[in-house]
């Protein structure tokens, strides 16, 4: 009887273990099937969610690149306008006559800003070859555009050591209070800068220059 009880007890334990094992298998099988069924749904949803997200990211990156390119372009334009030696002239209310092609016409004067660097004598010769002279400042009112000049340019003003005066190419004497002469270097020639200032410079130093032609 004890053997039978032991056998029944062992059988009950085995059945219990088998039942538990079957339950575990069933759970695992259910879990596996559920995951297999869930994965396509998740992947499908992921694909559905990823596609707009990827598209948005692509647009954001493209806009970022476009912004960087635009900033670079505008920076280059700004720097070029900041350091460019040529001057943009407001022509409102101005009067003018015929000028050489591509020259600036302002109040019966023609101006050309040359970016090539020459010494004073070479600059003078270049202007003369175009039937013009180096810049002559004679009126703050008629030549108010010269306030916009940002860089240093040769003008037709030269120092006469014998009498200490400053004369223009045509021999006329510099009018008082027309230009503020500033000694930048030892020399007998003058550069024009902004706000009606003249800077003394060695005549052999290469600089850009302004040619001027009167139309009347």
Curated annotation (Swiss-Prot):
InterPro entries: C-type_lectin-like (IPR001304), C-type_lectin-like/link_sf (IPR016186), CTDL_fold (IPR016187), NKG2D (IPR042169), NKR-like_CTLD (IPR033992). GO terms for cellular component: cell surface; external side of plasma membrane. Residues 98-213 form the C-type lectin domain. The chain crosses the membrane at residues 52-72. Its main location: membrane. The keyword Ribonucleoprotein does not apply. CDD domains: CLECT_NK_receptors_like. It is a single-pass type II membrane protein. It comes from the Eukaryota. SUPFAM superfamilies: C-type lectin-like. Glycans are attached at residues 115, 131, 163, 202. Residues 1-51 are cytoplasmic. It is found in: Cell membrane. Residues 73-216 are extracellular. Disulfide bonds join 96-105, 99-110, 127-211, 189-203. GO terms for molecular function: carbohydrate binding; signaling receptor activity. Keywords: Adaptive immunity, Cell membrane, Differentiation, Disulfide bond, Glycoprotein, Immunity, Innate immunity, Lectin, Membrane, Receptor, Signal-anchor, Transmembrane, Transmembrane helix. GO terms for biological process: adaptive immune response; cell differentiation; innate immune response; positive regulation of natural killer cell mediated cytotoxicity. Homodimer; disulfide-linked. Heterohexamer composed of two subunits of KLRK1 and four subunits of HCST/DAP10. Interacts (via transmembrane domain) with HCST/DAP10 (via transmembrane domain); the interaction is required for KLRK1 NK cell surface and induces NK cell-mediated cytotoxicity. Can form disulfide-bonded heterodimer with CD94. Interacts with CEACAM1; recruits PTPN6 that dephosphorylates VAV1. Is not capable of signal transduction by itself, but operates through the adapter protein HCST. Functions as an activating and costimulatory receptor involved in immunosurveillance upon binding to various cellular stress-inducible ligands displayed at the surface of autologous tumor cells and virus-infected cells. Provides both stimulatory and costimulatory innate immune responses on activated killer (NK) cells, leading to cytotoxic activity. Acts as a costimulatory receptor for T-cell receptor (TCR) in CD8(+) T-cell-mediated adaptive immune responses by amplifying T-cell activation. Stimulates perforin-mediated elimination of ligand-expressing tumor cells. This is NKG2-D type II integral membrane protein. The lineage of its organism: Eukaryota, Metazoa, Chordata, Craniata, Vertebrata.
